[in-house]
Amino acid sequence: MLAVPLAVHVVVIDNSQPGLNLSFIQDERVTVVPTGANLGYGRGHNIALAASSRRCRYNLVLNTDLQMGPEVLPGLVEFMDAHPSAGMTMPKVLYPDGSLQRLCRLLPVPVDLIGRRFFARTRWAKARNRQYEFHDWNYDTVAEFPFLSGCFMLIRRSVLDTTGYFDERYFLYAEDLDLSRRINAVSRTLYVPSQCVVHEYRSQTRPSLRRLRYAAVSLTRYFSKWGWVHDPARYQANRKTLDQFDR
């Protein structure tokens, strides 16, 4: 991150117990914030966002298992500078073997996420997921989506000041969905495939009961907040997204 040809401020959240010895980091561009515990994905990133320099025009939220070349961040910053309506961008994301991660999505209805989590191998769940993740699209052109993955979110600071940070009621899962739709409501959330990163994500064929519990709690909170059935903003955002491909 420090090798990119930009002025950057890196905030590292150390949630280990006891804290790691990071005294070897002497670069003034790096701030280490020890929390002493895992506070959750959203809350941890909120601490980093609050600690970031107020002079930053953009904030980057990314997973620790993500790799990118030094050209990616400058390329996306250049794109957002040229497109002031863009509040957030995400690059093309690949698995380590070079295959595509389909991370451009619609705002889900409950059946979408229930199907993905518990009935993924059924025909109806596969059909819904095909539209939800745009399997019939080539992922090679700039397009707008209301839900972009939290593994890499480059966010315009002025937009983030308007929407607020992550909702800390989600410990794990759905925090990126919630923030992405709030940003999409006030600006454009764009997929920019001219830049590419590698995400070493590995899905669990049999997720632990603990993770299933986190998912159930977070999704219950999400749909209770935005609406289980009646969610006009969801319908409008999804219709706008699908209309891009009907022209």
Task: Give the positions of each predicted feature.
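Acidic donor-binding segment of Leloir-type glycosyltransferases
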Residues: 1-37, 47, 51-54
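Active-site acidic Asp-centered loop
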Residues: 15, 35, 61-64, 167
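Acidic metal-phosphate-binding loop of nucleotide-sugar-dependent transferases
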Residues: 39, 65-68, 170
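Short beta-strand-to-loop acidic/aromatic patch adjacent to the donor-nucleotide binding site
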Residues: 55-67
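Conserved donor NDP-sugar-binding/catalytic core segment of glycosyltransferases
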Residues: 67-103
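Short, flexible, basic/aromatic active-site loop/helix in glycosyltransferases
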Residues: 108-145
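A short, conserved alpha-helix in the catalytic core of glycosyltransferases
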Residues: 137-140, 144-196
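Active-site-adjacent helix/loop segment of glycosyltransferases
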Residues: 177-181, 185-247
